[in-house]
Each structure stands twice: as structure tokens, then as C-alpha cells.
């Protein structure tokens, strides 16, 4: 089994669950989140197939960190890879932590939030310092001259912050 490449379906599945109260949608979102970073990466496996044609040349540099699939989400401690995808995934993780009252997932969300806002965020509140693959780089690498800080990443960060406040049941909150 695999999981979606771009973490957005998990958010939609949680919303669908909240509207229908059909747990199968919530369970599928949890399945995708829990599977990420474990076992084979089917996107890398596809590239190994004979005759594979790369549609996007920039993806010659694709790695599992780009898609937050370098390790299971519960073991991730630093914001990595594509900044929008990351914050969408973190938002879904916070939603699932709230719905399942999953303490381990809640702690993973806190760890990722703390790393991002204390070590990988500009003073303006933007995230994602590299224009190359629109991604996070390393702690405190926040260049002024090549700052990327895509608007979508900042909006996704706001989504994550709102969900962190909901998860922690703190209003007003530090998130």
C-alpha cells in the first residue's frame, strides 16, 4: 500500500468525517499519516522502473525529506521538505491527534511546531526559506537575500496553528 504524494487529501478526509460522522474517512486519513515514512517509497520505486520518464526535471533531486517521508511522522522532530506540504501534513496530524486523543501524535505536533517557529521561521512569520523546491533547509538558515517564503506555506502554517490551538484546547493560545 502507498500514500498520497501531496498531503492534502488527509485534510479533506477529516473534514468529510466531521460532516458525515462516518469514521471510515477519519480512519483513512489516519492510515495515510501513519504509513508515511514507513517501508517503501513508491515515488522513488517508480523512478527505478525501466522506461520511466521524468515529467518534472526539478524532481531529479527528489528525496523522501521533500515529502516528509524520511521517517514515520511520530518520530519527526524537525520541519523538513516542501513547506506547504509539510504544514498541510502537520495540520492533518493535529486534527487526527485531536479526534483520536492520540498523545504521541500530539507530542509530535508540538515538536514540529516548536522547531518550525523557533528555528525555521522568519521574523515576519513566513516559513520555507529556499526557493529551490520551495522547502525548509536547516535550523537558523533564514537568508534575507534569497528568502522564498511562499504565501501558501504561511497560510498552511496558520492552518496548523489554528489546529494546534484546537488540539490543546487553548483559546487564546500561543499558536
What residue ranges belong to the model's regions?
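Glycan-recognition and catalytic cores of secretory/periplasmic carbohydrate-active enzymes
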Residues: 1-175
Amino acid at each position: 500500500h502507498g500514500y498520497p504524494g501531496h498531503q492534502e487529501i488527509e485534510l479533506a478526509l477529516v473534514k468529510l468525517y466531521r460532516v458525515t460522522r462516518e469514521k471510515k474517512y477519519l480512519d483513512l486519513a489516519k492510515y495515510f499519516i501513519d504509513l508515511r515514512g514507513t517501508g517503501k517509497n513508491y515515488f522513488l520505486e517508480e523512478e527505478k522502473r525501466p522506461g520511466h520518464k521524468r515529467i518534472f526535471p526539478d524532481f531529479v533531486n527528489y528525496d523522501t525529506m521533500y515529502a516528509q517521508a524520511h521517517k514515520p511522522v511520530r518520530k519527526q522532530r524537525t520541519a523538513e521538505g516542501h513547506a506547504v506540504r509539510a504544514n498541510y501534513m502537520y495540520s492533518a496530524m493535529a486534527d487526527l491527534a485531536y479526534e483520536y486523543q492520540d498523545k504521541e501524535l500530539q507530542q509530535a505536533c508540538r515538536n514540529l511546531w516548536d522547531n518550525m517557529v523557533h528555528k525555521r521561521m522568519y521574523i515576519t512569520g513566513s516559513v520555507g526559506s529556499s526557493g529551490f523546491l520551495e522547502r525548509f533547509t536547516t535550523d537558523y538558515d533564514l537568508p534575507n537575500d534569497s528568502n522564498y517564503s511562499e504565501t501558501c506555506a504561511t497560510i498552511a502554517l496558520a492552518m496548523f496553528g489554528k489546529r494546534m490551538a484546537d488540539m490543546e484546547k487553548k483559546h487564546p493560545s500561543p499558536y
